[in-house]
Amino acid sequence: MKTVLITGANKGIGFETARQLAQLNYFVYLGSRNKEHGLEAVKKLNDIGITNVETVAIDVADINSVRQARQELETKISSLDILINNAGIAGDQPQDFATGDVENLRRVFDTNFFGTVQTTQEFLPLLKKSGQAAIINVSSEVGSIALRTETGRNTNRDKYNTYGSSKTALNAFTVMLANELHDTGIIVNSVTPGYTATDLNQFQGAKTPEQGAMPIVKLAIQSDPGITAKFFKDGGEVAW
């Protein structure tokens, strides 16, 4: 049974991703900043007959927490097949660069970018032991430079410059790490769930968490080692 770690998996898209992968016979570790919330999420899955799940406490913005999570998993598994970097925060409004709060920007980057980087670094040795592993970074179209500069662009995305720039950085990390790991058997890709109703956007998204999880799951279960350094959405690729 392949093993998966999903950060931010006690609710929303992360929880739905965990549910769907567990139903496909993956063993899923649900990462949660709060251990109790993680246990509650596991119970919800147990209550519907899903038992191939456990929780692990991990705050991706806290390196000590990340290391403790890695040490915990090392006592349970010899390798990790899939790491899904899902944990993220939206940040406060306003998010314009001209006058926005730099401390807000730092907080968002600490989780969405630096948190992803340090989590990936800590779990990379376990991923390398898999033989064929995948790192999936959950991104957003608001981080796409191509969409931000296209003719007739959606100016509504300008409301999310703090969040969006953290995802732009995340996408750069995806490409550069994929290039670094090209001969290791580890593929690295970004994926956007789309505008999904979660607490990240006060449940205003058009998609359900179940729908938002689908492109993540699709990417997780594909086995083509040549698919790396790409940015996916439901139904295709996204321009960087």
Feature roles, as predicted:
Residues 84, 119-123, 127, 173-174, ...:
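Hydrophobic positions on the long internal alpha-helix
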Residues 89, 93-109, 128, 132-182:
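Catalytic loop of short-chain dehydrogenase/reductase
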